[in-house]
């Protein structure tokens, strides 16, 4: 059986790892073993954070909607409840965009939600200053 020489493949494998590690600090960009460990961890972080990003954006949208809703006299949960009762199907991303870029349109959605809510539920609770 013929002998297999691995020099070309080994050099290519190491070069690919070191290219991926370009820009890392210190030994992590220059030494193969350290670079390999860091590239592996970086791929794990990237995989994890691609999934975490979705939740982070949802939380950001909810904060923006809540701030704009409170400026219009409703809390976030009452706004969502009112829109649901009114049959308005707008997702949180679009609501947040409207709240930031088109306040008049968002205010009309708040009025629609207020009209759909039962009585005595549209006013947000005010914290008592004791």
From Swiss-Prot:
User: Which processes are annotated in GO (biological process)?
Assistant: ribosomal large subunit assembly; translation
For the keyword rRNA-binding, the answer is yes
Q: Looking at the record's lineage, which domain of life comes first?
A: Bacteria
Cellular component terms (Gene Ontology): ribonucleoprotein complex; ribosome
Extract the Pfam families matched here.
Ribosomal_L20 (PF00453)
Which UniProt keywords are given for this protein, alphabetically ordered?
Answer: Ribonucleoprotein, Ribosomal protein, RNA-binding, rRNA-binding
Q: Which cysteines are joined by disulfide bonds?
A: none
Task: Read off the InterPro entries from this record.
Answer: Ribosomal_bL20, RIBOSOMAL_L20_CS, Ribosomal_protein_bL20_C
GO MF annotations in UniProt: rRNA binding; structural constituent of ribosome
Similarity-based family: Belongs to the bacterial ribosomal protein bL20 family.
Protein task: Binds directly to 23S ribosomal RNA and is necessary for the in vitro assembly process of the 50S ribosomal subunit. It is not involved in the protein synthesizing functions of that subunit.
Name assigned to this protein: Large ribosomal subunit protein bL20
Taxonomic source organism: Clavibacter michiganensis subsp. michiganensis (strain NCPPB 382)
Question: What gene is it encoded by?
Answer: rplT
């Amino acid at each position: 059986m013929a002998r297999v020489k691995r020099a070309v493949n080994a050099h290519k494998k190491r070069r690919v790892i070191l290219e991926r590690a370009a820009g890392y600090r210190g030994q992590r960009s220059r030494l193969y073993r350290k670079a390999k460990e860091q590239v592996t961890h970086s791929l794990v972080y990237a995989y994890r954070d691609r999934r975490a990003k979705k939740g982070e954006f949802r939380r950001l949208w909810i904060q923006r909607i809540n701030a704009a809703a409170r400026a219009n006299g409703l809390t976030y949960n009452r706004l969502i409840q009112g829109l649901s009762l009114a049959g308005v199907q707008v997702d949180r991303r679009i609501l947040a965009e409207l709240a930031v870029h088109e306040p008049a349109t968002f205010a009309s959605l708040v009025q629609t939600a207020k009209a759909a809510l039962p009585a005595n539920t549209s006013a947000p609770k005010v914290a008592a200053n004791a």
